[in-house]
Amino acid sequence: MGAMAEIQFIRGINEEVVPDVRLTRARDGSSGQAMFYFDNPKIVQEGNLEVTGMYMVDEEGEIVTRDVNAKFINGQPVAIEATYTMRSPQEWDRFIRFMDRYAASHGLGFQKSENS
């Protein structure tokens, strides 16, 4: 069994819905952003909106973003959007290592857009 990587909105509780992930990166590689979109995630289905952050957990430790927002339609939560901002090449590399593990353990077709 390979290394597991999980996304959690509450520490210790894995989110089962695999998100859409979009990546942007500065041309000079100094910074980047990852936008996560979870369509009807488990935490929303369970009516738990006490979300204070998104935790990306793997063998190296934990990456945390507090930029997490629920999306509502007709007053009902339907999705969660989270943004993780990377402010250095090291943070970018660390995030990519997490995403590679997450993609491998969750069957996510994760594509890095390479600028050639």
Curated annotation (Swiss-Prot):
<comment type="function">
    <text>A photosystem II (PSII) assembly factor that binds PSII during biogenesis, protecting the complex until water splitting is activated.</text>
</comment>
<dbReference type="InterPro" id="IPR038676">
    <property type="entry name" value="Psb28_c1_sf"/>
</dbReference>
<protein>
    <recommendedName>
        <fullName>Photosystem II assembly factor Psb28 protein</fullName>
    </recommendedName>
</protein>
<dbReference type="GO" id="GO:0009654">
    <property type="term" value="C:photosystem II oxygen evolving complex"/>
</dbReference>
<comment type="similarity">
    <text>Belongs to the Psb28 family.</text>
</comment>
<dbReference type="GO" id="GO:0031676">
    <property type="term" value="C:plasma membrane-derived thylakoid membrane"/>
</dbReference>
<dbReference type="Pfam" id="PF03912">
    <property type="entry name" value="Psb28"/>
</dbReference>
<keyword id="KW-0472">Membrane</keyword>
<dbReference type="InterPro" id="IPR005610">
    <property type="entry name" value="PSII_Psb28_class-1"/>
</dbReference>
<keyword id="KW-0602">Photosynthesis</keyword>
<keyword id="KW-0604">Photosystem II</keyword>
<dbReference type="GO" id="GO:0015979">
    <property type="term" value="P:photosynthesis"/>
</dbReference>
<comment type="subunit">
    <text>Part of a photosystem II (PSII) assembly intermediate complex PSII-I; crystallized from a strain deleted of psbJ, it forms monomeric PSII before addition of the oxygen evolving complex. PSII-I includes 3 assembly factors not found in mature PSII (Psb27, Psb28 and Psb34). This protein binds to the cytoplasmic face of D1 and D2 (psbA and psbD), contacting CP47 (psbB) directly above the quinone b-binding site.</text>
</comment>
<keyword id="KW-0793">Thylakoid</keyword>
